[in-house]
Amino acid sequence: MIYVDIRGVYPLLSNSSILEAFFFAVSELMPRKKNLDVTVSICSLRSDTTGYHIKTDRYTHEIELERNQNKEDFLTALFHEIVHVRQTERGVYCDESRPYYKRPTEIEAYKLQEELLKKWKYLQS
């Protein structure tokens, strides 16, 4: 079963809309995934950060998203962090010896976040 717990409030989207976007991304990125437990915390982060992801246990993840950003950036950050969920579920971890933007995990996450956002916006229109 896929469990999602949203903590906090994002003023520009309802929690049900955030859940809808979450499940859209999971179905696009991990269509056969059956076991997943994700906590999405909406909070204030460092000024240069829009989101974080950490795997805390098998199938268990935490995502933190900056609450003070526009709706498109918020969704983009959500999709970006869900790409990291997929990566760690597949056993792919970031190489912190490389500069941030040269890490294969970040290159993939930035590419897929844009593809997901484009498809999401199309489906919502």
What do the predicted segments below correspond to?
Residues 1-11, 33-48:
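Hydrophobic or amphipathic, alpha-helical segments that drive membrane association/targeting
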Residues 12-36:
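Zn2+-dependent metallopeptidase catalytic core
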Residues 82-96:
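Catalytic Zn2+-binding segment of zinc metalloproteases
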Residues 97-125:
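Post-HExxH zinc-binding segment in Zn-dependent metallohydrolases
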